[in-house]
Structures are given as structure tokens and as C-alpha cells.
Amino acid sequence: MSKSLYEYDFPKDLKKMTFDELDLLSYQIRDFLIEKVSKTGGHLAPNLGVVELTLALHFTFDSPKDKLIWDVGHQSYVHKILTGRAKGFDSLRQFGGMSGFPKVCESPHDVFDTGHSSTAISLSMGMAVSRDLKHDDYNIVAIIGDGAMTGGLAFEGLNNISESGRRVIVILNDNGMSISPNVGGLAKHLRNLRTSNQYLNIKKTAKKVVDVPYIGDSLYKGMRNAKDHMKYALLPKGILFEELGLTYLGPVDGHNVEELVNAMQAAKKINGPVLIHAITKKGKGYRSAENNPDKFHGIGSFNPCTGLPNPSKGVSYSSIAGDEILSMAKDHDDVVAVSAAMCDATGLRKFADKYPERFFDVGIAEAHGVTFSAGMAASGLRPVVAIYSSFLQRAYDQIIEDVCIQKLPVIFAIDRAGVVGADGETHHGNFDIAYLSTMPNMTVFTPNGEKQLREAFRIAYGLKSPCAIRYPRGECPLDNNAVAEPNCISENTVIDLTKYATERSFSGQDVDIWAVGRMQEKAKEIRIILEEKGMSVGIVNVKMVKPIDLSEFDDKAKIIVTLEDGTLNGGFGEQFSSKLYTQRIDRDRFENNQTSLISKDEYNNKVITIGWPDKFIEHGDVKNLEKKYSLDAESIAANIEKRYNELNLDR
């Protein structure tokens, strides 16, 4: 009877195994992944596709002395199993449990905290410089793929490595996918390489030659020189990576451990940058994931027997946003949609199917996607760019330089805004309010629920200027009238944003809560708690954080609370407070030298700003994270009541 994965002493035991034993282990690992991820959710399909690749890595290299750098990091589950962390999978991505990404604090085998795409090659170059300057001797391996090679940063790194000539091994995990299928010229080039039998046969021969005693290395170098002269005849389009200065090994079967080990051993003998091109299948070994790799890229809990996800509670913000963008496209021929390799995840699949000529997937290239959209906007189109909040950070410069400065009508549909949970620090979207609100010409919508979300898109189309619409992950509160309302916004509509930005839903003399976006729902919970304690509580729904509208400001309220699902530093609360100090209005009760809405002393006493603290928030269920950081309704209500009592206010 074979051992369970918990009984192995990994990675030590791995190096004692035969190739046949490693093949058997690959089946065991896949069964383990399916069982565990079906309960916790996670990145299943990418990890099923790298089982043999990861086995070969830990069989060939000596981690942690040799540095294994996982690009993005979502494909590191097998790596975690093979470095002694199998028991951690019961708490994978759970509050207080094991991260779904490499974490330096978790294991010495995790050499860098990754989470975003296309960084591993640049990281490997930096580590190679450090190694060489210190005269150390170890291998540095960057594992990149699952679409990450479509990112420009990856090619900046390749360019730098090829120029330096430093000893770095890049392993390209080519599964033809990112989240959606790979797009662009690079994807076509890789497909050509996969089908080049002539080149593959030469490489197989070369790998055999390396193993010839005493003379193998010399013969291999000679074959490399001969290959340089032959490749143009064999492959008219050339080998892109060879032209960039890397020795190219492959394509190799990414599900054959022996082939992979042979390629890696050959790469270790080359004194310079090497790229191993491994062909893998995303979702390998689990039919549901093989047939629907995009659905199983990142998935919640599911039934492992049927492959069907566990029932969701409702309709997501992403789905409603996608429907509204499609509705805009039906009404306006100039509307186009742009995705960064996340068509399904951002709700754009219906749009792509209905209007394929108006849908553009730019790959994992957010910066390019924004400037590409700016070009379309400058030429008369109305692009809607649907990107996760965390990933939009990668295009910060392009938003300012190419969109806002020229006041171009690009609509940013910012999905997964706020703290999103299980994927942790690298995937939370809690900085967008702070950085987008500082950009001149930018309008920022923060809708809560279906009605406000649909309205935001309709108003944004009519503004003819840069607009950002941020909305959270998960279930969207529905409104039966939201779809039925006519689309009254046209290119000639004039919108008075100051009359739309805020909306009072409740009035109260004791506490006034200004709630941004999804926090409007939490404000209702807080109101119930405080009113049971005898307080009168008002709520202002903040549907836009730029411009900030103070028309609903009630200076008679004893306590004013701002509530946002974003970082406090530079967030709505700080900007709201600043405007209270500086806004100049005419009111009879103010003298000429007292023109602010609120004095500094009053502010210190009565204004409470609530949001996420100045730190990177870890992974875990959102409710648990809110509880830890006192952002749950009960903790916020207690905080307000404490301030109220400290001021000796009457109820």
C-alpha cells in the first residue's frame, strides 16, 4: 500500500524515486489536489497542469539552495506539497491558514512573495546578479506560463537577461491559456514551435548526446553551432527566444517527468541563459477541468464527482456589470469592450459572443490595454476596460498619461474592488479609491446594488470623460426595477453629478453614517444596532467618491462616520474630512472669517473615519478579516457608541 502524502519526507524522499514511482506519485498528487480544492476553492486547473513539471524541478534541483521562482504563484500548490506542506491544504486560502501563493514567511523554499503576472524573469535576473557578485554557486529557475509571457514585463526581463549572459534557467509552462485562452503573436509563435517536428527531433538527439561520457558536452556545443546555421532553413519564422539570446530547449512533453528532467539537466550544464519550453495541459487528469480550464482556473468549492460548483447565493456584480455593458453596446455602436485575459471572470463572455469584432482581449497586459483603449477613445470609440482592481494598479501611469491628461472617454469597469478574501495581499483591491481620486478629470463611481451599478454605467457613457466604476466581488443586491428602467442617458444628456453623488436613505440626529459602495449594506446593520440602544441614526449613500458632494451634510448630527471598503490612507474618509475643512459656502451662521463647514476641534470630536488600516491585509474570508480589523457591524457600532459616551452626549 502506498504512503499518503503526509508520510513522505519531501523533498528528500523525492530524489530517491524512480521515474515510474514519480509517475505514480503524480496520480496521487492530482487526487489530493482535487479532494482538497473542492472543499476550500482555489486555483485547481493551473496546478493540475504542472504536477510532472514540479516533480521534475524538485528531482533535479536542490531547493532551497537552488532558487525556484514561481511567476504569479498560483501554480505553486504542488511545490508546497513537495516541500512538506501537504497538511496545510485543509486550511488552504482560509483565514489563518496556508496561502494559495508563495510566502517567504511560510517556508524557506518560497524565495519571493509573488501574486501578479510576468515578474519571475526580472526577479531571477536580480537574484543572478546578487549570486554572481557574491561569488556564490547555485541555480536560479524562473517558472513562468499560464499566459504570463503575454505581459510586457516578461520580455523586458528576457531582454535584460540575454544582454547580461547570466546563468538563469527560464521554464515556460505553455498550456495555451492564461485564464482565458492566450492571444496575440506570441501565442501563435508558440503554437508553431509545438508543431515543428524537425526542431523537436534535433533537440531530442542533442539531449542524448549530452549524456555521452567525456565527450558529451563538446559534441552538444558543436550541435548547437550547427543548429544555429540550420534553424533558418528549418523554421523560416525563426525561434523568438534564440533571437533574444537564450538557448532554447524544447518543446518537451510537460507531462513526461523523464523528458523534463533530461531537459533540466541539460540546462544546468549551459553557462548562460536558457529557456525550456514545456507543453502542458491545463486541468490535466481531471476531465471537468480539462474540458473547462477557464472555469477551473480559480474556482470556489465544488462537487468533485460532477465537477459542478456548489450553488451560489445570488447574481454577482461581475455578471450584472457584463449585462449592462452588453446593453450599452446594443444601444451605442461606438461601445467596445477590453479585457486583460479575463473575459469570463469580468462578465464579458456574452459581449464577446455577441460582438466579437468589438471585443478585444489584450492578454495579461493591463498597461497596454489602457493605452490601446486610449487610442480607440481618441479616435471616436467608447471603450469599457474591465479589469480587477488589484491588476489595474499595473496601469497607473497609463491611466494618468494616456487617458486623464487628454480627458478621454474611457470607462474603467473595476471588478473585485475592496478586500476580496482568499487570495490575500496581492489580490485585494483596497487602494483604488485613494489613487484614482487624485487624478484630475477622473470621475469615480462607487455603486451598491444593481440599480446603482446600472445607473453608473449609463451616466458614465454620457459624461464623455474618464470614469471609473468600482464594485466588489460577490453577490449583488438586486432591484426588480433596475433592468426595466429605460436607458435615458444619451450623448446629449447633461448630468449634474452633485445631485447624483450622494443620496440620503435615513435621517438621524445622533449619528450620520456616510457609507461608500457596498458598505451601505453594513451601515443598515449598524443603524439597527445603534437604534436598539436609543440612538437616532442617519445614512447617506455615497454613490460617487469623486466628486465629493456635501449637499447632504447635516451639521446638527452629533457624530459623523465615514465608512469605506478601502484603505484609510488617502481614501474617502480623509478626502471627505479635508473638504469639510476647506469648502467655502455661504451660510448665515458663519461670519466672513469662519467659512468652513466644521472647525478642527469639532472634527476631532465628532468625525470617525472607518476603513482598512495602513497595512497589507492577509488572506481569509472577508467576514473574518472584517472581524479582526473591527470592520464588522458590531465592532463599528461599539466604536461609535464609545465615542458617543466619551463626549457625554444625550440620546
Pin down the residues of each PLM region.
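Cofactor-binding active-site loop characterized by glycine-rich and histidine/acidic residues
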Residues: 43-164, 334-335, 340, 348-349
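Glycine-rich, histidine-containing beta strand-loop boundary motifs that form or position
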Residues: 48, 70-72, 144-145, 172-174, ...
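Helix-enriched interaction subdomains in cytosolic or periplasmic regions
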Residues: 301-303, 437-482
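Short beta->alpha connector loops at strand-helix junctions that form conserved
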Residues: 362-363, 387-388, 446-449, 563-565
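Thiamine diphosphate
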Residues: 91-123, 133-137, 163-295, 308-353, ...
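Short alpha-helical segments and helix-capping/turn motifs at coil-helix boundaries
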Residues: 38, 50-59, 123-128, 152-159, ...
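Extended, hydrophobic alpha-helical segments in both membrane/secreted and soluble proteins
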Residues: 140, 144-149, 153-157, 347, ...
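N-terminal amphipathic, basic-rich helices that act as targeting or association modules
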Residues: 2-81, 240-246, 251-257, 277-280
